[in-house]
C-alpha cells in the first residue's frame, strides 16, 4: 500500500503527520512525501525523515498545487492500493488496516472514512455513527465526488 502526502511549506506540522502514518498497525506501507516546491525548510525536514525509515521516499516538483503533487505520487507509487493524507493531518493508528481490510474483505475498490476536525476552540466530527468505512466501486465513488456527496479520507 502506498500513502501519498503532498507537502507545501509544512515544516510546522508534517513531522506529526508522518509519525502518525509510520505508527500504523498495518506496516507494509510505502510513504511518498511529495514536496510541491516548498520555500521554507520543509524539503530538508522531509529528507531527514526519509533517512530514518526505508519506507519513506521524497519526491520533489515545482509548485503546481495539491492535485499535481498527488498525481506525481500516483505515478511513482508501488502499492496495489493508495491512500491520501494531507500534510497537516494525523491519522488514527489503525486507519489503513481498517480501510484496506474492508476493501479486501468485500472486493470494494474504494473505502472512505470520516474525519475529525479539531482546533483549540472546537471539535467537529464527520464520521459514520458506527465507525465503519463507506465502501463502493470506482463508478460510485466518482459519481459521489462529482455530486459532492462523498467526502472524507479514502484508499
Describe these PLM feature segments:
Residues 1-155:
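Nucleotide-sugar donor-binding/catalytic module of glycosyltransferases
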Amino acid at each position: 500500500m502506498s500513502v501519498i502526502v503532498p507537502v507545501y511549506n509544512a515544516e510546522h506540522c508534517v513531522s506529526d503527520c508522518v509519525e502518525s502514518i509510520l505508527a500504523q498497525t498495518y506496516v507494509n506501507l510505502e510513504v511518498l512525501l511529495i514536496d510541491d516546491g516548498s520555500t521554507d525548510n520543509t524539503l530538508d525536514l522531509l529528507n531527514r525523515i526519509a533517512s530514518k525509515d526505508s519506507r519513506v521516499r521524497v519526491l520533489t516538483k515545482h509548485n503546481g498545487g495539491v492535485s499535481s503533487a498527488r498525481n506525481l505520487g500516483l505515478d511513482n507509487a508501488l502499492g496495489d492500493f493508495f491512500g491520501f493524507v494531507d500534510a497537516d493531518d494525523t491519522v488514527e493508528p489503525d486507519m489503513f488496516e481498517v480501510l484496506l481490510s474492508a476493501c479486501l474483505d468485500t472486493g470494494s475498490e474504494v473505502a472512505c472514512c470520516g474525519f475529525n476536525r479539531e482546533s483549540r476552540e472546537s471539535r467537529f466530527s464527520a464520521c459514520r455513527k458506527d465507525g465503519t468505512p463507506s465502501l463502493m466501486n470506482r463508478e460510485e465513488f466518482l459519481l459521489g465526488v462529482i455530486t459532492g456527496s462523498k467526502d472524507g479520507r479514502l484508499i
